Each structure stands twice: as structure tokens, then as C-alpha cells.
Amino acid sequence: LELVDKMGREFYLSELLEPLEKRFDFIILDCPPSLGLLTLNALCAAKEILVPLQCEFFALEGIVKLLQTYEQVKKRLNPQLWLLGVVLTMFDGRNRLTRQVQDEVNRCFPDQIFKTVIPRTVRLSEAPSFGKSILHYDIKSKGSEAYLSLAKEIVMRKPGSRTATAE
């Protein structure tokens, strides 16, 4: 779709999703790692954002830009937008850079970090090449366990959630 010159282009996705909101508890929009029109549309359509952060040096620069964009969108376009949290991905606790990134993120965003981290594993890397989610590819893998744990944490963080709903 050519939205570049359309009035209200940042709300196009929001308008498309509106009829679906009553049918689903969650609608997940997986955005590209850029801050283009697709991501802007997703930020305008979303109620919460979950930021996956790879445990790599340049990811820290990217999160700063993303959070600046988040603040601008919240202020000007979508006042109901809420930062659900940041989840560390491709986590390898044996790697010094991973631990440095974790420390820096904990220092900068102490209240926004999920306890669950998504590990760097071969099984997580293999699953997409078979056209499967990690839960369908290997339910007993560390990656599956991590994503299930993250899902429970997400449910617990949502406004109005109760302990019983996460089980």
C-alpha cells in the first residue's frame, strides 16, 4: 500500500484492527527493527508495547531511539500507549557482552525489564527454517520454556490482570 502521501496514514492499521479488538484478548504486531511507517502504524494501533532487545552492543542504541519515538507517539498520537516492558533476547549468560548489556539495561530501565530472558539456542534458530514456532518445533526446549514464562509474565503485567489469570 502506498500510504506515504495519505492523510492520517499513521492510523491506517488502527482502523483495520478496531473491529477485531472485541474478538481477541491479545493482538500481537511483530514489527521490523526500523522506525518507518509500518512501525509508526503499529505504535498508533497498540495499547502496549513489548520491546525485544538482543543482547548486543548496537541494540542499546536502537532501544534509545525506539523509546524516544514511543514518547513522541504517546504524547502526540496515542496517549493510551503504555510500555509493557523490555525482554532480553539471544541471551547467553556465559558471554561477557551479554552480561554488560543486561547490566546497562537494568541500570537504564530498572522497572521495565522482564525477569524472563530468551536464551540463544540452536533450537530457537532452527524452528523458523521448518516453518514452526518453537512451541511446535520443540515444546521441551529451553526456548519454549522461556517463551511460556514470558507469556505468563506479560499476562501478569497487563493492567487489570489477576494472579489466577496467569495460570
Model-flagged regions — what are they?
Residues 12, 65, 146:
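Charged catalytic carboxylate motif
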Residues 128-149:
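C-terminal boundary of histidine-terminating zinc-finger modules
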Residues 15-122:
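Conserved catalytic-core segment of NTP-binding enzymes
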Residues 6-9, 59-62, 143:
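Short, conserved glycine- and acidic-residue-centered signature motifs
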